[in-house]
Amino acid sequence: MTELLGSYVPIAIFIGIALVIGLALLVAPFAVAFKAPDSEKLSAYECGFNAFDDARMKFDVRFYLVSILFIIFDLEVAFLFPWAVSFKEMGWFGFWSMMVFLLVLTVGFIYEWKKGALEWN
């Protein structure tokens, strides 16, 4: 048991060093930075002019929907590549499990299409 856990010691040391360096990089600017706020430093600056309007714009919900659909189908491709590489070793169970996965995604895509979620009218 100790031999098994002993092989993880370098990984634990690496994670510990990474955490210490990350926290040091997060805390260092607050400890070292010179703070002298004035009206010009606190004002909004945009291309040499004061801001004309509020920088926050309302986005249509369809942009978020398209981005979520992109992420879903991008993950589908990420699952398809390892499946295609190890297709011969997995046999029929791997084939049919991927077909079920693709069927669920296809049904979801058809549902989104029929509901009109992809229409931009």
UniProtKB/Swiss-Prot annotation:
Keyword Calcium carried by entry: no
Membrane topology: Multi-pass membrane protein
One Pfam family, short name: Oxidored_q4
Entries under InterPro entries matching the protein: NAD(P)H_OxRDtase_bac/plastid, NADH_UbQ/plastoQ_OxRdtase_su3, NDAH_ubi_oxred_su3_sf
Chief place where the protein resides: membrane
Catalytic EC class: translocase
Its job: NDH-1 shuttles electrons from NADH, via FMN and iron-sulfur (Fe-S) centers, to quinones in the respiratory chain. The immediate electron acceptor for the enzyme in this species is believed to be ubiquinone. Couples the redox reaction to proton translocation (for every two electrons transferred, four hydrogen ions are translocated across the cytoplasmic membrane), and thus conserves the redox energy in a proton gradient.
Protein family: Belongs to the complex I subunit 3 family.
Protein known as: NADH-quinone oxidoreductase subunit A 1
Source organism per UniProt: Rhizobium meliloti (strain 1021)
